[in-house]
């Protein structure tokens, strides 16, 4: 009997493999979250800037809106219009399938 040992091949430590897999995953996830937050902040600033730009141009008066709606309704009553249905131009004279002339 000989007292020699067989050299073992070096095995990768499982903890280091986890680091090689999870490290890039968390790095990519972190970069994605940062990009999403930056895009959200830019969009919010753009919308706020647009709202502040357009707000002085628009003044809402509910009483004025009601008066305009009443005027539109009154003007529609005096102005008769002919309204055709969507089927009016597509209706054709239909011939019965079993039209037997005797």
Curated annotation (Swiss-Prot):
InterPro entries, from UniProt?
Answer: SMIM29
Tell me the keywords, alphabetical order.
Answer: Glycoprotein, Membrane, Transmembrane, Transmembrane helix
Q: Where in the cell is it found?
A: Membrane
Entry GO CC: membrane
Main location group? membrane
List residues traversing the bilayer.
21-41
The protein depicted here goes by the name: Small integral membrane protein 29
Q: How does it sit in the membrane?
A: Single-pass membrane protein
List all annotated glycosylation positions: 3
